[in-house]
Amino acid sequence: VHWTAEEKQLITGLWGKVNVADCGAEALARLLIVYPWTQRFFASFGNLSSPTAILGNPMVRAHGKKVLTSFGEAVKNLDNIKNTFAQLSELHCDKLHVDPENFRLLGDILIIVLAAHFGKDFTPECQAALQKLVRVVAHALARKYH
């Protein structure tokens, strides 16, 4: 993947302002609420019976932070995303059996969360760069699937 200097600047500039805990919790909670079939991968998280339960679930919050912290590794390694996510791809494919389509869904939700958090600072150019990034990350995570 080729990144322009402008794309790199837009991505790193915005990412530097992201509250990983809050945005991660919101993104994962939205995934579980908007696409309820994804909840089956999180059975060990306890009560996911309603949007209120999901939004208040500390395990959802903690895992959301973990997911976005990992996503931050993509931002730090824009030129080597495939290798950055090789182990996570293997884990999600071989052990967790996550449908790779869920990576794309989470990426789209992350864009919505960032747009909501950053308002007018989330310009169309910024959205384009981040949409490209979430596609590349989703592709890297799906790499180990046959």
Swiss-Prot record:
InterPro entries: Globin, Globin-like_sf, Globin/Proto, Hemoglobin_b, Hemoglobin_oxygen_transport
CDD domains found in the cross-reference section: Hb-beta-like (cd08925)
One Pfam family cited in the UniProt record for this chain: Globin
Superkingdom classification of source: Eukaryota
UniProt feature coiled coil, ranges: none
Listed SUPFAM superfamilies: Globin-like
TM region(s), chain numbering: none
GO molecular function: haptoglobin binding; heme binding; metal ion binding; organic acid binding; oxygen binding; oxygen carrier activity; peroxidase activity
This protein's UniProt keywords: Heme, Iron, Metal-binding, Oxygen transport, Transport
Tissue: Red blood cells.
Gene3D superfamilies, per the entry: Globins
PROSITE patterns (UniProt xref): GLOBIN
Keyword Iron in annotation: yes
CC annotations in GO: blood microparticle; haptoglobin-hemoglobin complex; hemoglobin complex
Domain Globin, chain residue ranges per copy: 2-146
Binding-site positions, heme b: 63, 92
Function: Involved in oxygen transport from the lung to the various peripheral tissues.
Name of the protein in its database record: Hemoglobin subunit beta
Name of the gene: HBB
